[in-house]
């Protein structure tokens, strides 16, 4: 009989072990056996909680997406300035939060993006994440710009966030958060300046 209250603990152990395994050997070589060993559990526990490796990857991505959402939400809740600029900066900062730019998270995101092209459940997660980012950016830009300019600015800033993140992930070095923030801030300020132009 399973111990009461163990499910959340086991799931968390396995998600963190997945992040560690992907960081160490990549998604392709992150076997169920390796993940179980890193989590200190038997292989069968993964099947019990997640069915298979794809289920575990989906749960791991939901964990990262939840951390991303929390990082953005906390920054926006702490704002004293309700301007579109302040909200846009908070969204950018949340996307470059340490929970998203540490080595294990970055490698897992890269594996997720590649796998999402072939797995419908992961593709749905990716689409939801893309839509959420675009929608939040567009709403804030729309507070100050025309609808067409707001949509274009939101697409541009979303692409810039993803591009800065991807280039940072592929360097193999520690992510330069300050540089990424400064580039993104400069872009959003240029877009917001169109109101008076």
Swiss-Prot record:
Relate the protein's function as given in its record.
Repressor involved in the biosynthesis of the osmoprotectant glycine betaine. It represses transcription of the choline transporter BetT and the genes of BetAB involved in the synthesis of glycine betaine.
Q: Which NCBIfam families match?
A: betaine_BetI, PRK00767.1
> To which species is this protein native?
Pseudomonas aeruginosa (strain ATCC 15692 / DSM 22644 / CIP 104116 / JCM 14847 / LMG 12228 / 1C / PRS 101 / PAO1)
Protein name, per record: HTH-type transcriptional regulator BetI
* GO molecular function (one): transcription cis-regulatory region binding
Which pathway does this chain act in? Amine and polyamine biosynthesis; betaine biosynthesis via choline pathway [regulation]
- Which SUPFAM superfamilies does the entry mention? Homeodomain-like, Tetracyclin repressor-like, C-terminal domain
Please verify whether the record's keywords include Hydrolase: no
Q: Which GO terms describe its biological process?
A: glycine betaine biosynthetic process from choline; negative regulation of DNA-templated transcription; regulation of DNA-templated transcription
């Amino acid at each position: 009989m399973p111990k009461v209250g163990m499910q959340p603990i086991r799931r968390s152990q396995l998600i963190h072990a997945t992040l560690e395994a992907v960081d160490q050997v990549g998604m392709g070589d992150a076997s169920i056996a390796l993940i179980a060993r890193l989590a200190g559990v038997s292989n069968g526990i993964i099947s019990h909680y997640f069915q298979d490796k794809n289920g575990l990857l989906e749960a791991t991505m939901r964990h990262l997406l939840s951390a991303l959402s929390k990082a953005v939400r906390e920054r926006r809740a702490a704002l004293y300035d309700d301007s579109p600029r302040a909200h846009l900066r908070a969204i950018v900062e949340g996307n470059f939060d340490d929970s998203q730019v540490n080595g294990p998270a970055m490698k897992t995101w890269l594996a997720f993006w590649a796998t999402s092209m072939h797995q419908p459940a992961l593709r749905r997660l990716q689409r939801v994440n893309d839509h959420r980012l675009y929608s939040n950016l567009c709403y804030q830009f729309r507070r100050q710009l025309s609808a067409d300019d707001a949509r274009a600015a939101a697409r541009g800033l979303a692409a810039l966030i993803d591009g800065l993140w991807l280039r940072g992930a592929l360097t193999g070095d520690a992510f330069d958060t300050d540089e990424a923030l400064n580039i993104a801030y400069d872009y959003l300020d240029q877009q917001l300046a169109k109101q008076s132009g």
